[in-house]
Swiss-Prot record:
Compartment(s): Cytoplasm, Cytosol; Mitochondrion matrix
Family: Belongs to the globin family.
Post-translational modification: Phosphorylated during hypoxia by ERK1/ERK2. Phosphorylation regulates the heme pocket hexacoordination preventing the association of His-64 with the heme metal center. Thereby, promotes the access of dioxygen and nitrite to the heme and stimulates the nitrite reductase activity. Phosphorylation during hypoxia is stabilized by 14-3-3 proteins.
CDD domains: Ngb
Name assigned to this protein: Neuroglobin
Lineage summary: Eukaryota, Metazoa, Chordata, Craniata, Vertebrata
GO biological process, one term: cellular response to hypoxia
PANTHER family: BLR2807 PROTEIN (PTHR46458), NEUROGLOBIN (PTHR46458:SF19)
One GO term describing the cellular component: mitochondrial matrix
Transmembrane segments: none
Length: 151
């Protein structure tokens, strides 16, 4: 990824980061539409959610959304040197495997991320911006996959 892509990512993230919980909720609502089988993986205090809406409104899950948005923020901040996040992201991959997330679900998360960005940014979400974010997410997933695979 080159400097122009880095700037597209940073510029677009500024708009999203003003309301991370709102936009993170859009991301996860889309994820549950794409992969409803992920919903049972989210349990807090032995509570099983009856619907995506039930999950998306729970304080515990809202905290999870905040954490995910912080990880995205860290990737944006370190876009020029993602290797600095390598160990952290590998650890996230291990954690996701431990709770039953399939490696293939990372693809649906990527689709959901792009969907959220498109909804948030509207016409400023250009093909070049989409491509830059796809590259960034691909690098994040590559690091998480290493952890998921036990590397």
């Amino acid at each position: 990824m080159e400097r122009p892509e880095h700037e597209l990512i940073r510029q677009s993230w500024r708009a999203v980061s003003r309301s991370p919980l709102e936009h993170g909720t859009v991301l996860f609502a889309r994820l549950f539409d794409l992969e409803p089988d992920l919903l049972p993986l989210f349990q807090y205090n032995c509570r099983q959610f009856s619907s995506p809406e039930d999950c998306l409104s729970s304080p515990e899950f809202l905290d999870h959304i905040r954490k995910v948005m912080l990880v995205i923020d860290a990737a944006v901040t370190n876009v020029e040197d993602l290797s600095s996040l390598e160990e952290y992201l590998a650890g996230l991959g291990r954690k996701h495997r431990a709770v039953g997330v399939k490696l293939s679900s990372f693809s649906a998360v990527g689709e959901s991320l792009l969907y959220m960005l498109e909804k948030c940014l509207g016409p400023t979400f250009t093909p070049a911006t989409r491509a830059a974010w796809s590259q960034l997410y691909g690098a994040v997933v590559q690091a998480m996959s290493r952890g998921w695979n036990g590397e």
